[in-house]
Amino acid sequence: MEEDRNWIVVPTWRVPGRMEKWHALVKYLKYRTKDLEEVRYVPHHKVGWAWWTCSRVIFPLQGKSHLEIQAYWNLTPEKGWLSSHAVRLTWYTEKFWTDVTPDCADILIHSTYFSCFTAGEVRRAIRGEKLLSCCNYPQAHKAQVPSLQYLALVVVQQNDRPQRKGTARKQWRRDHWRGLRVAREDHRSLKQGGSEPSAPRAHFPGVAKVLEILA
């Protein structure tokens, strides 16, 4: 008698292809800048009996909870099916787990990692003083209703950037994507095991942008 097959269906997000950019950025922020020093990185590996392979990045969060981002390869060996590459975003505690959206993942990560404006920045801005902190994860605020204080601090932060005859926007983009650029150049040196001085802290562009999530 043929055994019944039990299927487990989980929601995933389609991505266009391989995830080297994602892995390189995680390693850069974990080993170079130390922004993600507490994050556990499990490289690309085979999963027991399964035909597909995956990698895992586990973010310890506040309150003994975790966010896990799993990247999958070779999901659909039959040609013509859905994309062979996907990612799954899961938030879990000891007794509960649920899948989350990229926007929610950004908020969860920013709740523990990457600096943001401190409480005293509003008073400094009112007095016309230079801000002592900034938000290195602006994408995490996109899905939220921003407060007037946050919007005002963003404007002050943008006005504090040096203006260079129309190149301010280009300069901001270069700073915003600094982590990705350095990660592409740096993942080779990480493989060689060379030791270099710690790099300056980088902005995080957001989960959806780094993974290039399609749907």
From Swiss-Prot:
Would I find Lipoprotein among this entry's keywords?
no
How far does the signal peptide extend, from start to end residue? Answer: none
Q: How is it modified after translation?
A: Processed in virion by the viral protease. Highly phosphorylated on serine and threonine residues.
List the InterPro entries. Answer: Vif
Motif range (HCCH motif): 110-141
Please give the residue positions where the record annotates the modification Phosphothreonine. T98
Where is this gene product found? Host cytoplasm; Host cell membrane; Virion
Q: What is its main location?
A: host cell
This protein's superkingdom? Viruses
Q: Which GO terms describe its cellular component?
A: host cell cytoplasm; host cell plasma membrane; membrane; virion component
An additional note in the Swiss-Prot or TrEMBL entry is: Required for replication in 'nonpermissive' cells, including primary T-cells, macrophages and certain T-cell lines, but is dispensable for replication in 'permissive' cell lines, such as 293T cells. In nonpermissive cells, Vif-defective viruses can produce virions, but they fail to complete reverse transcription and cannot successfully infect new cells. Vif-defective viruses show catastrophic failure in reverse transcription due to APOBEC-induced mutations that initiate a DNA base repair pathway and compromise the structural integrity of the ssDNA. In the absence of Vif, the virion is morphologically abnormal.
Write out the domain note: The BC-like-box motif mediates the interaction with elongin BC complex.
Member of which family? Belongs to the primate lentivirus group Vif protein family.
Name used for this protein in its record: Virion infectivity factor
